[in-house]
């Protein structure tokens, strides 16, 4: 295994590794780099879904929909509940312990599309921004039809480090209210305007230190509804100011997909965006969420 750094100075590129055969020590190194550098890229892989989760499981506990599906199966669902249950079953790759999500418009053998199969951009976001139990890592694997599509990432550790000492002090005690509803849309214009799952009970700090001791900004600006203690107008002005700081090119990594690519990213101190893609009915990514439970820091 060889480790290089991308030309942007922070994204990690791992070469000369077959993740099917990766050992615990290699997983330890890769997991640690995800936490410290926020994005790790590994190319030229040929993995089954089970091999994907096997590697992710070397880094931490892999998220599964088993309990949620089992609870739904025990419940007398109304029509809306049945529709949601069927939708969730459709986004999951079969025979993977309900842990691998298909990101695609391609239909499964029962005619159900995967997650986020729309062609329009899926604008800047992170995993489960409104939930305290959120997994801190997202794995994306290019299964097929990925060429010509692009996903970009932001590193908020670097963005935080570039702040003045005065702004670091100002931001230290700021808390945010977050939420998201996919029914509201995916673009910057509408991403944060649907409101049925805003979480006012959990208000995370804007400045966050992750499990590796790296400090950055937890600031999912398109999933952010308000800043605690500010009115709507002041919140909007503040969010736009910080957003514009984060959207500087020097904090970004752009990935132009090829089949067999893996991108692993940390979800506290990073955001990602899928750009417009007209071939979502052919493009299939696998998405796995997990934590750092097996990594020693």
List each language-model region with its residue ranges.
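Fe(II)/2-oxoglutarate oxygenase catalytic core
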Residues: 2-264, 268-297
């Amino acid at each position: 295994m060889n480790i290089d750094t991308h030309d942007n100075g922070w994204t990690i590129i791992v070469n000369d590794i077959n993740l099917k055969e990766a050992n615990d020590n290699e997983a330890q190194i890769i997991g640690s780099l995800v936490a410290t550098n926020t994005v790790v890229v590994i190319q030229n892989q040929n993995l089954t879904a089970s091999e994907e989760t096997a590697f992710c499981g070397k880094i931490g506990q892999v998220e599964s929909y088993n309990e949620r599906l089992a609870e739904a199966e025990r419940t007398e669902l109304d029509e809306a509940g049945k529709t949601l249950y069927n939708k969730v079953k459709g986004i999951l790759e079969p025979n993977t312990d309900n842990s691998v999500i298909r990101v695609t418009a391609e239909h499964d053998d029962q005619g159900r599309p995967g997650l986020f199969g729309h062609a329009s951009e899926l604008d800047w976001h992170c995993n489960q921004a409104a939930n305290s139990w959120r997994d801190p890592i997202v794995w994306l694997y290019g299964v097929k039809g990925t060429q010509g599509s692009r996903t970009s990432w932001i590193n908020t550790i670097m963005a935080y480090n570039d702040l003045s000492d005065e702004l670091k002090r100002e931001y230290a005690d700021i808390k945010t209210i977050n939420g998201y509803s996919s029914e509201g849309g995916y673009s910057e214009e509408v991403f944060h305007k649907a409101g049925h799952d805003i979480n006012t009970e959990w208000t995370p700090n804007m400045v966050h230190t992750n499990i590796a001791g790296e400090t950055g900004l937890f600031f999912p600006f398109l999933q952010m509804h308000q800043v605690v203690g500010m009115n709507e107008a002041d919140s909007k002005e503040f969010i736009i100011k910080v957003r514009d700081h984060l959207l500087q090119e020097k904090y970004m990594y752009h990935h132009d997909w090829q089949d067999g690519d893996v991108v692993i990213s940390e979800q506290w101190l990073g955001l990602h965006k899928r750009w417009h893609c007209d071939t979502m009915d052919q493009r299939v990514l696998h998405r796995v969420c997990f934590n750092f439970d097996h990594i020693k820091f």
